[in-house]
Amino acid sequence: MTTIVSVRRNNQVVIAGDGQVSLGNTVMKGNARKVRRLYHNKVLAGFAGGTADAFTLFERFESKLEMHQGHLMRAAVEMAKDWRSDRVLRKLEALLAVADTECSLIITGNGDVVQPENDLIAIGSGGNFAQAAATALLENTDLSAKEIAEKSLTIAGDICVFTNQFKTIEELNY
């Protein structure tokens, strides 16, 4: 699987992800980009789960963003509706973490949209490790959102065998 983490602090939101693609217990690729910018570089998105499934979700989500003029919450809710009713989407095994300058969301494999209370998202096999590290850093340091995302991803990569140290980090400042 992978680890994706999103942190929001001091007018900055970041989504970061590692680059490992695994097939069973074998590492197939170490430098995959699982974090992207969407909708005229105004929305960040990261995925955890099956790579082919995630690319399908990226395409569908980007079309929803276009349809709703970049309104993240509306696009996410519409995507979730499709996910629940579309037979192809229901079989996709992936999670999306998405963020813009106003909100951060998780779109789950069940078609749920979750807005975390503290604007911290961590998904994937190393998500719990990254979330614990990011929470501690948010509560006990003055590090930037980017620094927290990077450090928490490093910690997750040190612990989780399905997460490596190759990082893709995207940020929005507002």
From Swiss-Prot:
Q: Where in the cell is it found?
A: Cytoplasm
Q: What EC designation does it have?
A: 3.4.25.2
Q: Name one GO molecular function term.
A: threonine-type endopeptidase activity
Listed A to Z, the keywords are: Allosteric enzyme, Cytoplasm, Hydrolase, Metal-binding, Protease, Sodium, Threonine protease
Activity regulation as described: Allosterically activated by HslU binding.
Tell whether Cell membrane is among the UniProt keywords.
no
Source organism's superkingdom? Answer: Bacteria
- InterPro entries the UniProt entry points to: ATP-dep_Prtase_HsIV_su, Ntn_hydrolases_N, Proteasome_sua/b, Proteasome_suB-type
Top-level EC class as recorded in UniProt: hydrolase
Listed GO biological process terms: proteolysis involved in protein catabolic process
Subunit composition and interactions? A double ring-shaped homohexamer of HslV is capped on each side by a ring-shaped HslU homohexamer. The assembly of the HslU/HslV complex is dependent on binding of ATP.
What does the UniProt record say this protein does?
Protease subunit of a proteasome-like degradation complex believed to be a general protein degrading machinery.
Query: Which family does the entry's similarity section mention?
Result: Belongs to the peptidase T1B family. HslV subfamily.
Name it: ATP-dependent protease subunit HslV
The protein's organism comes out as: Shewanella loihica (strain ATCC BAA-1088 / PV-4)
